[in-house]
Amino acid sequence: MKYDVIVLGSGPGGYVTAIRASQLGFKVAVIEKENLGGVCLNWGCIPTKALLKSAQVFDYLKHASDYGLSVSSFDKDFTAVVGRSRGIADGMSKGVQFLMKKNKIDVIDGFGKVKPGKKIDVTAADGKVTEYTADNIIIATGARSRELPNLPQDGVKVIGYRKAMTLEKQPKSMIAPPPFFTGSVNQCRNSGEQPISLGPRCPSIMTTFRIVPKDFSSLTICHILA
């Protein structure tokens, strides 16, 4: 099938581009192998902030007297907290699906592989491969997590961000390596903010050659120690 524009990836960069292209009169398709909305809506920005909000409300309750309120009893339900987060993510993804339908954008389910000649092979879940062509192909695939060398994710002691977002039981402690702190954000804090505690200890690890902000990148360790 032939399109004016094919967008590979349905994250914030992809679906917004697709909508605008459709509004300008182009025949548009979006290729997505998972849920519409990409990592941001399904596993990153949106659900982590939902978890943070639950943690914030819990923190407010612990300090209710500071606001002139008296709360006799309260507790956290970790399963419900995670369930709320996943529900919000699902709702946002369905919202993107509605926008695709509203703007008459075809959604092609499968894994897309760009080929020469402005062609894309899409492999569906059943293994069937279909070729699509377009005058313009926009790659908006984003990124994926990378395992640390010699430290594979076993799903128990070492977990990825998706597992961290769907834990059935709250861990007593966890460590989140850089560059992104999704693992710790979804439990107790946001990078740069004060801890908002739901319980676990969340130390952060930084790996860098500088101990000053990037704004001062001209400074080296030699300058600092001089």
Task: Explain the meaning of each model-derived region.
Residues 2-3, 19-26, 31-171:
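Glycine-rich flavin
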Residues 6, 41, 49, 134, ...:
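Hydrophobic residues within membrane-embedded alpha helices
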Residues 8-9, 31, 139, 177:
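Conserved N-terminal Rossmann-fold NAD(P)-binding element of oxidoreductases
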Residues 161, 173-180, 189:
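Short, compositionally biased segments
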Residues 14:
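N-terminal Rossmann-fold NAD(P) dinucleotide-binding loop
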Residues 1-11, 172-176:
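Beta1/beta-strand and adjacent pyrophosphate-binding region of the FAD-binding site
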Residues 182-184, 188-191, 195-222, 226:
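Low-acidity, Ser/Thr- and Arg-rich intrinsically disordered low-complexity segments
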